[in-house]
């Protein structure tokens, strides 16, 4: 019985959360500007990291980009953000980058 209770608690934490709410989206936009921008440039046009503008990412898949966000890129300075972001957060950021034009 204790095992079943533990399993139910663990599964409850893995339920599909869905897209981030408006407040979390604001936090993620801030993270993109501050944290991603520190390497990819304030306009995401490149710096230490490669450009991540919508134009530079054209043709990339949301799932592929979210995997890079979560797991980083071995052999580069790109860290994995899995300890801080959910998969839904990473997909939202990937979609945001693919659709947002920088000025």
Swiss-Prot record:
One of its GO terms (molecular function) is electron transfer activity. It comes from the Bacteria. One of its GO terms (cellular component) is periplasmic space. Keywords: Electron transport, Heme, Iron, Metal-binding, Periplasm, Signal, Transport. Its main location: periplasm. Residues 1-17 form the signal peptide. Gene3D superfamilies: Cytochrome c-like domain. Monoheme c-type cytochrome. This is Cytochrome c55X. The gene is nirC.
């Amino acid at each position: 019985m204790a095992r079943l209770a533990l399993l139910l608690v663990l599964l409850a934490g893995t339920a599909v959360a869905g897209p981030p709410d408006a407040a979390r989206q604001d936090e993620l936009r801030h993270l993109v500007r501050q944290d991603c921008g520190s390497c990819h440039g304030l306009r995401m046009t490149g710096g230490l990291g490669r450009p991540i503008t919508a134009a530079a990412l054209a043709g990339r898949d949301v799932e592929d980009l979210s995997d890079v966000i979560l797991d980083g890129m071995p052999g580069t300075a790109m860290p994995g953000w899995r300890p801080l972001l959910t998969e839904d957060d990473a997909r939202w950021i990937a979609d945001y980058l693919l659709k947002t034009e920088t000025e």
